[in-house]
Amino acid sequence: MQQSLAVKTFEDLFAELGDRARTRPADSTTVAALDGGVHALGKKLLEEAGEVWLAAEHESNDALAEEISQLLYWTQVLMISRGLSLDDVYRKL
């Protein structure tokens, strides 16, 4: 699989989100989501998973990719909230 130069990897995103969690910028959606707690994050994950399913059924591949990217973002925010590392997840793959 070939990547373009502008691609953000799963690892890049996790590092970026971890940095936001540590530095807590005032205008950060990630910080607000973390402050909302696991229950709110779980609800958001369910919403995003539903949007992925609907996009797979009714939308273009580009729209589906966008929805999947949002699901991955929220999954990583939940991981950070619970203190999971990428290696914790990779060991289960």
UniProtKB/Swiss-Prot annotation:
<dbReference type="GO" id="GO:0000287">
    <property type="term" value="F:magnesium ion binding"/>
</dbReference>
<protein>
    <recommendedName>
        <fullName>Phosphoribosyl-ATP pyrophosphatase</fullName>
        <ecNumber>3.6.1.31</ecNumber>
    </recommendedName>
</protein>
<dbReference type="GO" id="GO:0005737">
    <property type="term" value="C:cytoplasm"/>
</dbReference>
<keyword id="KW-0368">Histidine biosynthesis</keyword>
<keyword id="KW-0547">Nucleotide-binding</keyword>
<comment type="pathway">
    <text>Amino-acid biosynthesis; L-histidine biosynthesis; L-histidine from 5-phospho-alpha-D-ribose 1-diphosphate: step 2/9.</text>
</comment>
<dbReference type="GO" id="GO:0009274">
    <property type="term" value="C:peptidoglycan-based cell wall"/>
</dbReference>
<dbReference type="InterPro" id="IPR021130">
    <property type="entry name" value="PRib-ATP_PPHydrolase-like"/>
</dbReference>
<dbReference type="GO" id="GO:0005524">
    <property type="term" value="F:ATP binding"/>
</dbReference>
<keyword id="KW-0378">Hydrolase</keyword>
<dbReference type="InterPro" id="IPR008179">
    <property type="entry name" value="HisE"/>
</dbReference>
<keyword id="KW-0028">Amino-acid biosynthesis</keyword>
<dbReference type="GO" id="GO:0004636">
    <property type="term" value="F:phosphoribosyl-ATP diphosphatase activity"/>
</dbReference>
<comment type="similarity">
    <text>Belongs to the PRA-PH family.</text>
</comment>
<keyword id="KW-0963">Cytoplasm</keyword>
<dbReference type="GO" id="GO:0075139">
    <property type="term" value="P:response to host iron concentration"/>
</dbReference>
<dbReference type="Pfam" id="PF01503">
    <property type="entry name" value="PRA-PH"/>
</dbReference>
<keyword id="KW-0067">ATP-binding</keyword>
<dbReference type="GO" id="GO:0000105">
    <property type="term" value="P:L-histidine biosynthetic process"/>
</dbReference>
